[in-house]
A protein has these predicted regions:
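Nucleotide/phosphate-binding catalytic cleft detector across ATP-hydrolyzing
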Residues: 1-197, 214-219
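Ser/Thr-glycine-rich phosphate-binding loops at phosphate-binding pockets of nucleotides
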Residues: 201-206
């Protein structure tokens, strides 16, 4: 279910342990979020997107003069919003563990209704950023998970989501799994000749070859 108006976003549905599973595709052009919610009495996967636009400093205020869309990360202020006039350039590998990414991800989570809630977060990385020398780049991934545990404060007073776990996935590979998985049965489709995924994002294009046994060809 795709949500076009945030005011119509359904309430997130918790797991049995009280946590919430949520995935954020924190791309260069857009932040996409997906989570489980109850819609018309049934459990459905819902998603929506927000522009990845943020500017250093306190830029926007509401009609009452209060800072709007402002987040303080490790002592530095960032304004997040579709209408910021001078957005920061975020098309670099370092964006994934930057303060501005932390502000954008937290803004997206709060917009989805996760303020003050315990979440199990998944985020993505371009395929060639996830691997280094044919191995998972664990040091780089550690920087990302640590960056999203940075001190972040909303000027509006909104409670921050509580990230109890955070896993990072190669984006195009996650897309292959999502395409192949039957949500109702939990089974995977089979592909006689494997599967090729082309992920065209706001700043990167990933091509991933998935073999018949769902191993990844990293050549």
């Amino acid at each position: 279910m795709v949500i076009k108006e945030l005011k119509n976003a359904p309430t997130p549905l918790p797991e049995e342990d009280g946590t919430y599973k949520v995935f954020v595709d924190n791309g260069y052009a857009q932040n996409k979020i997906a989570y489980w919610a109850e819609v018309d009495g049934t459990k459905q996967l819902v998603n929506f997107l927000l522009p990845s636009r943020a500017q250093m400093g306190r830029v926007n205020v509401d009609v009452h003069g209060r800072a709007s869309g402002v987040y303080t990360v490790n002592g530095s202020d960032y304004t997040v919003g579709e209408d910021v006039r001078d957005p920061e350039t975020i098309r670099s590998k370092q964006y994934a563990h930057s303060e501005i990414n932390c502000a954008l991800v937290m803004h997206t989570l709060i917009a989805a209704g996760f303020s003050g809630l315990k979440i199990r977060l998944g985020t993505g990385l371009p395929f060639d950023h996830y691997f280094r020398n044919r191995e998972v780049d664990k040091a780089f991934i550690k920087k990302i998970t640590e960056s999203l545990s940075s001190e972040c404060i909303s000027a509006s007073g909104s409670e921050m989501p509580i990230i109890v776990s955070h896993r990072v996935y190669p984006e195009s590979t996650a897309a292959a799994v999502a395409f192949s998985l039957d949500i109702d049965s939990g089974d995977f489709k089979t592909f006689e000749n494997g599967l090729v995924v082309i992920d065209m994002g706001g700043g990167t294009t990933d091509i991933t070859v998935i073999n018949r046994d769902f191993t990844i060809n990293i050549d």
